[in-house]
Amino acid sequence: MNDQPAVISPPMPRRTMLAAALAAVVVPLSGCGGSAGEAASVAPRESVTLPASGRPSASPEGLTPESPAQDLPAPDEAIPKDPKRLADALTRTAGRLRDAIDDWRRTGDPAKGEAPEPVVLLSLYEQRVYRHLARNPAVASRTYGKLPKDMVARARDNVTAIRDLLSLAHPVSGPIKIKVESPEPADALLADFRRAERRFGVEWEVLAAVMLVETKFGRVRSPSYVGARGPMQFMPGTWKAYGMGGDIDDTGDALLAAANYLHASGAPGDYRRALYAYNHSQAYVDAVLLHARQMKRDIRNYYAYYTWQVYVITTKGERRLTGP
């Protein structure tokens, strides 16, 4: 994308139908204060740590805490049905995922390599638990009461965001024709988010949350059924106005264009208005802001979201298209 001055035009409608999050639902993780029905807002950045990865009173089915190197959850690991065991499994998984992300950032190479297996498997299990709770509100309510106090808001935010997006999903019938691929490295994406923030003043966590919801950080590469394209799902007409001569399929260009569009639509002064212009759904706006809020509270939530996988909702149930 050219580094010429931004083309700022009046905000224009942009109904994408979310190739990943709505038509082929790609759903998130995270958490902070407020009730499930609360309107989300972008909180100030702060440093929040997750609960320590101590041993809970019960373990997820199939997991034993004695051998951490060997007890990573399988991709299809059973999810406990009892709220107490479910809360224990979620608490333990969150702590272990935090530690795995710290190890990855300290000893791995998030700027070049893929996420290590512990991060991928723990994140997938956590994502699956949140999806289960989003589809079962009564179970979710009982589970919240069994969680440590410092995890309740985090769980509630994640479940609420996923439920919001599921409410917008249109089940796919027939053959699934969705192109998926591996995302760019986590820290390479983070550099692009921060570059866009510096240029347009739109917080990088909001941009990351939009990309999470739209295409699971670029994993979904198919156009939406209405023709929205690229990692940030732009309609061609909107791209012409805000793309600044860049490539709609290039991640860095698409993030700059998204920041340009959101800035022209009211961000950072009014993120709700700007996001509603990006996609005309209050549920969408709430979900994006909940995810952004979680990343602002703890950057490790960004790395956890980065490893969330793509799900498609079909008339016969849901299918996971990416991951192990």
What are the language-model segments listed below?
Residues 1-195, 290-324:
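Cell-wall glycan-active module
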Residues 31, 218, 227-230, 266:
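Glycine-centered flexibility sites
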Residues 129-132, 136, 199, 213-216, ...:
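Amphipathic alpha-helical interaction surfaces
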Residues 213-218, 228, 238-240, 280-284, ...:
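Solvent-exposed loop/turn segments at secondary-structure junctions
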